[in-house]
Amino acid sequence: MTTLLSTIHSPEDLKRLRRDQLPELAQEIRDRLIECCSITGGHIGASLGVVELSIALLYEFDSPGDKIVWDVGHQAYAWKLLTGRNEQFPTLRQEGGISGFLKRSESDHDQFGAGHAGTAMSAALGMATARDLKGEQHKVVAVVGDGALTCGLSYEGMNNAGHSERDIILIVNDNGMSISPNVGAISKMLGRIVADPRTNRLRERIKGMTFALRGVFGEGVVDFAKNVEESVKNLFSPGMLFEELGFRYFGPIDGHDLQKLCDTLKFVRGMTGPRVVHVMTQKGKGFSFAESNQEKWHGLAAYDPVTGEARKKSSGPPTWTQVFGAGLTALAAEHPELVAVTAAMPSGTGTSVFQEKYPERFFDVGIAEGHAVTFAGGLATQGIRPVCAIYSTFLQRAYD
């Protein structure tokens, strides 16, 4: 039996489908991801969560003419399936196979290759600036996970994008997780935003009334309307960080409702200036094991898709990570001044054991390696003995 997915070799093929066929395609993509990753392993959790978003982006935008920039690539497996790499997908992360991340040399649809989180906004702004310098008209979209919003680089990009007033779209994929649960004020702010469509409707009505009343009451009504609009924003969306940075905000939107996603992206595509679409997704969507243990299923080796168990059970000695975590926890019992610091990876660094036993002495600062190291330095000046556990490749951003 021919599947919808097997007929799609490019975004043009996807656009030939009717909208009512897209949910069926989404299920086929999830089945394909679960099947292939059970053999190759991979970052399946986030990719399962953005299946509908991937479909909607390719359905409403014109990649590779429009530039879609995915942050990191952990989210981009469905993107690969829909952009001509379905047949190659069983070679994911294998020697001679396709990359587990986005790779410009692999596809014209992979606009930017990166291993660090937080780069998409700045890269997208660079592309939008280049477009304007060359007098071109295409759209530029940055897809950023809420985990990357714990990254200072994301805000450097957003700050410059809002100030530039360039035509650029930021899509926030909000699943409440990066690798481990997100931390910090930004994560809490996203969690407080109210999903109420009355916000944008009311703001548009205020603008309409302003123009109608200007002729009667003069320019003073414009200032009054602006104050009312500001109050509306704060009432429905506490904080409104994005609007303060110069972005027009839309959302939150159910990231698994294809009709709503397509309608919203089509509407936002027709606008200009910096704008942000806040999309709520579930990490591991459609795979019960990944839904129930999102941290474990962020990325893992081969597994049995029926039981969720690893295909190869280790019967050997403990790993270096396990030894490190156990040793650090043992030392903490003897040294009350010892604390642990990590950057969004307690499980990956082995410090989750320390976290469970000494939560008040454990600090997960999110995807903020530079802050982690400097924060640890501040602790050390006051007689505390911090152990800062970060993957070596991520530590590159904190050398200074």
Where are these regions (language model features)?
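Long, well-ordered, tryptophan-enriched scaffold segments
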Residues: 175-324
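Acidic, glycine-rich active-site loops and adjacent beta-strand->loop/helix elements
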Residues: 72-77, 144-151, 172-178, 283, ...
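Short acidic, glycine/serine/threonine-rich loops at helix termini
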Residues: 78-84, 149-158, 179-186, 190-191, ...
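N-terminal amphipathic, basic-rich helices that act as targeting or association modules
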Residues: 1-83, 241-281
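Cofactor-binding active-site loop characterized by glycine-rich and histidine/acidic residues
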Residues: 43-164, 320, 338, 342-343, ...
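Hydrophobic, small-residue-rich alpha-helical packing segments that form membrane-like cores
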Residues: 119-144, 148-195, 204, 232-238, ...
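A glycine-rich helix N-cap at a beta->alpha junction
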Residues: 87-102, 163-180, 198-201, 363
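Non-catalytic terminal/interface segments that mediate subunit docking, oligomerization
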Residues: 67, 281-396
